[in-house]
């Protein structure tokens, strides 16, 4: 299946230290890591890399710290094939600590200020007018307005504080059906998103249209043994946005997104196993 779409992400980046442990430490417990490594991560970064693999090119509008870690993050994103447009902030780059347990589940502790792009940043925002779809994970209201210039705009509840009250219409909001922090996030948005996609992991999920039409999808089978869950949700959302940008019907777009989530879930954090154009 040959698909084409011009895609972009507006959002945030973290520099992540992963530690593989038998289980997440209980209060007062010391648990030895069997493996550890550093990698660029965060919702925006994971989505941008997934989109670069599917579309061949992905624009990423972001903001980074002015320290060496911020520079490492930008360099690594470019190595992963992302076209990075980053404003610099006079703060330390946001980091995160991620435990990966024997079940592949991730437990995340962010460290530092969440750094997001602003619409007044000197970035090539006009390029978004020629984009088919944008995934928005963070930024101010002006940055969200720039993102809305694309044909399709998909967002995560992580950007709720910006989206709520902005008056910007979303083509889709992709949220968790199980996370208490994301359940029913659409209820506070005006205008309401045209489409709400509620993911439920191995149970698949459900979509709800603005006209109250609904549908469900089944989770795709893993292409191999279960790996790390880190990045699976954002890989799903990015692939769904890519499919919308390529004008696939909702059910087909969700089937593709489900495959992307399953492929990532069968890989190592943060990017191994992500779906590519060759897999379509």
Regions found by a protein language model. Name each.
Residues 1-61:
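Glycine-rich phosphate/adenosyl-contacting loop at the front of the ribokinase-like
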